[in-house]
Structure formats: C-alpha cells, structure tokens
Amino acid sequence: MRRLQRRIVQAQQQGKKRKVRALQFILTRSYSARCLAVRRVVENPGRRTPGVDGQILDTPEKKAQAVEKLSAEDYKAQPLKRVYIAKKNGRGRRPLGIPTMEDRARQALHLLALEPVAETTADPNSYGFRKERSVADAIEQCFILLARSTSPQWILEGDIQSCFDHAC
C-alpha cells in the first residue's frame, strides 16, 4: 500500500492525472488499504462512540465485516448523529456530528488515496493539520526566516479566532 502511495506521488509530480486516478482506484479497492482504514478507526480515541446505527467495531468478526463492507459499490452514507457539547468558554453548546463506524472507515480509506496528492501539491510553508508536521516545525521555519539580514524588523500578531464564531 505504501508503494502504491509513492506511485501516486510520482504520477502527480509528473502531471499524469489519469494514472493518479487509476492508482487511487486500485488503492481504495486493495485489501490491505481496507484493513488499515478499519484499523485506524478502531484505534482512534472515539472508537467507543457509535453513530446513528449504534454499532461499534469491538469484535474481530465485526472488524472483518467492516473490511468487507468497504469493497461494496452500493455505498450510501448514513446521517450523522447530532450531539451537543459545551464550548470551552462555558457559554453555550456547539453541535458535533458523529458518523457511523462504516462511514469513518470509508473516510479513512479515501484519505489513504487522497493524502499523497494533497501533500504533494500543498504549500510547503503550511503547517496546520498536516501529517508529519508540527508546531515545532513552524517555529523552526520562523526562526530560519527571521535570522536573515533581509528579514522584517517587526512582527505583528493578531487574534482572529472570534471572527469564525459567527460564520454562516
């Protein structure tokens, strides 16, 4: 599976879009990728939180069934289970949508196929929510850029978090 992901990266770098799609198709149907997707779901901290169907993958038999279900072509996503959790500031609650285990596994499977392309085409100076990148990497890059003789003399900091609370 890792080899397939490397081939997807190479095809993306060469601009071979049809080959990328073909390799992604192969990857999403491979048994090892389906097993890994289910494994990621059952090893996730939210593994004991069922969706609207009430199912959790707590036995080897259920995990094997989930792997087989991922090969089905007649997939239709289930509605999300809506739960309200308290906000950090203590004022009000925010909605949280919880997908079923099957939906989570399918999302994990497609992430395996899409991530090589996303990481290949992403901005090299983007550090948020990226695999193999951390806050420490972003800080290190800031120090490297600011250590130059042509670096800016001022750094401005702004807090725009509250701007997103009222988005439509």
What are these regions (language model features)?
Residues V20-K88, R93-R94, P99:
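Phosphate/adenylate-binding "loop-and-lid" substructures adjacent to NTP/NAD/dNTP-binding pockets
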Residues Q10-Q13, T28, P95-T100, G128, ...:
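Short, charged/polar micro-motifs that form catalytic or ligand-binding hotspots
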Residues G15, L70-S71, F143, A147:
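Inter-domain linker/hinge segments that demarcate the starts of reverse transcriptase
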Residues R7-I8, A66, C142:
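Generic hydrophobic alpha-helical segments
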Residues Q107, L114-H166:
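Active-site-proximal segment of RNA-dependent polymerases
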Residues K87-G90, R94-T120:
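Hydrophobic alpha-helical hairpins/lids featuring a short glycine-rich hinge
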Residues M1-G46, L112-G128:
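Charged boundary/loop elements
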